[in-house]
Design a protein with these regions (language model features):
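Extracellular/periplasmic, surface-exposed regions of secreted and cell-surface proteins
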Residues: 1-196
Length: 196
């Protein structure tokens, strides 16, 4: 992770991770997931000096990042066969048989979640009043789900694989008030917070 702040006004951050899992075939075992953000504290700009009596902080920001999800069945990329009992009786016992090979998905890989967010933060009146707002878009690709329907003549069910995609988007708003006063000679702190 790398952080950099210039003049306490311009903020940059970059981070990256590389995850590995034995649940995937060797050519898909590792996933690289970067993220980055930028921020601008307008309240620290010289031309905002007139607001410093009531505006403590005003920042706009944007970030983008990717994460990987490796929550899949262990070794789902390998063909397996199992033993099970048959209805055939030989020498007074039910006989075992080897089941048909399992069907495996092609190119099983990580689910990938890419998130994009823009927002602002503001603190007023000696940081007693705070506001935060965000708008985000989240794209999930290579979603690990059941495969498409196939004809019954295939003789087996479709394996789970990276067949899906999903997008969610929305906004979040938070407003809070925090203050303290004397009660019985002691400081009493209270806060009120609301979110949408």
């Amino acid at each position: 992770r790398v952080n950099y702040s210039l003049l306490k006004r311009y903020i940059f951050e970059f981070s990256a991770r590389e995850d590995g899992s034995s649940k995937f075939p060797s050519n898909q075992r590792w996933g690289f997931f970067p993220s980055g953000s930028i921020g601008w504290r307008l309240s620290e700009e010289p031309w905002m000096k007139a607001t410093r009596g009531w505006l403590d902080n005003f920042k706009i920001r944007a970030n983008a990042g990717a994460l990987g999800n490796g929550t899949v069945a262990a070794y789902a990329f390998l063909t397996t066969m199992g033993m099970k009992k048959t209805t055939a009786v030989f020498d007074g016992t039910l006989q075992n048989k080897v089941s048909d090979p399992s069907v495996v998905p092609d190119n099983l890989t990580w689910e990938k979640v890419a998130t994009y967010d823009i927002g602002l933060d503001a603190d007023f009146l000696k940081s007693r009043l705070s506001f935060s707002g965000d708008y985000y878009v989240r794209n999930t690709t290579d979603l690990y789900i059941n495969g498409p329907e196939i004809p019954a003549t295939f003789g087996d069910s479709t394996p789970k694989g990276n067949y899906g995609a999903l997008q969610t988007k929305g906004w979040e708003l938070t407003l809070s008030w925090r203050d303290q006063f004397k009660m019985g000679g002691k400081d009493f702190t209270y806060s009120i917070k609301g979110s949408l």
